[in-house]
């Protein structure tokens, strides 16, 4: 049975873990979103989130974006490769509605799945 949880072990928690992904990442991006990925030595994917005040001024907007990314990751984790992923928000992300945002995320997850199969 596929587990659809988002436990602590599925998150990037320390600055060292984030730095590892930023060093030599695979990138999939749109004008509003970048998802960086790097292979990990675990058997499951992990997710880290970066949503800066520079791009979304209000906390409730940043929280909405983070909540949508976590939910998308939670539902897609069984298909994703054993990589560490870092979600990076860029300008214009606040203008996307929830359904458009979810479609973009799904497209980026698919791109990372294809990149992982090639390498």
From Swiss-Prot:
GO terms for molecular function: 3'-tRNA processing endoribonuclease activity; ribonuclease P activity; tRNA binding. GO terms for cellular component: ribonuclease P complex. GO terms for biological process: tRNA 5'-leader removal. Its EC number is 3.1.26.5. Keywords: Endonuclease, Hydrolase, Nuclease, RNA-binding, tRNA processing. Signal peptide: none annotated. It catalyses: Endonucleolytic cleavage of RNA, removing 5'-extranucleotides from tRNA precursor. Gene3D superfamilies: 3.30.230.10. PROSITE patterns: RIBONUCLEASE_P. It comes from the Bacteria. Pfam families: Ribonuclease_P. Belongs to the RnpA family. Consists of a catalytic RNA component (M1 or rnpB) and a protein subunit. RNaseP catalyzes the removal of the 5'-leader sequence from pre-tRNA to produce the mature 5'-terminus. It can also cleave other RNA substrates such as 4.5S RNA. The protein component plays an auxiliary but essential role in vivo by binding to the 5'-leader sequence and broadening the substrate specificity of the ribozyme. This is Ribonuclease P protein component. It comes from Haemophilus influenzae (strain PittGG).
């Amino acid at each position: 049975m596929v587990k659809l949880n988002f436990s602590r072990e599925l998150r990037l928690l320390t600055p060292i873990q984030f730095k590892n992904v930023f060093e030599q990442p695979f990138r999939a991006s749109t004008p509003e979103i970048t998802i960086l990925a790097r292979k990990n030595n675990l058997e499951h994917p992990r997710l880290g989130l970066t949503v800066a005040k520079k791009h979304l001024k209000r906390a409730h907007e940043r929280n909405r974006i983070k909540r949508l990314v976590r939910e998308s990751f939670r539902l897609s984790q069984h298909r994703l490769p054993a990589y560490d992923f870092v979600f990076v928000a860029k300008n214009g992300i606040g203008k996307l509605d929830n359904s458009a945002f979810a479609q973009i995320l799904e497209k980026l997850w698919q791109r990372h799945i294809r990149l992982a199969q090639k390498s």
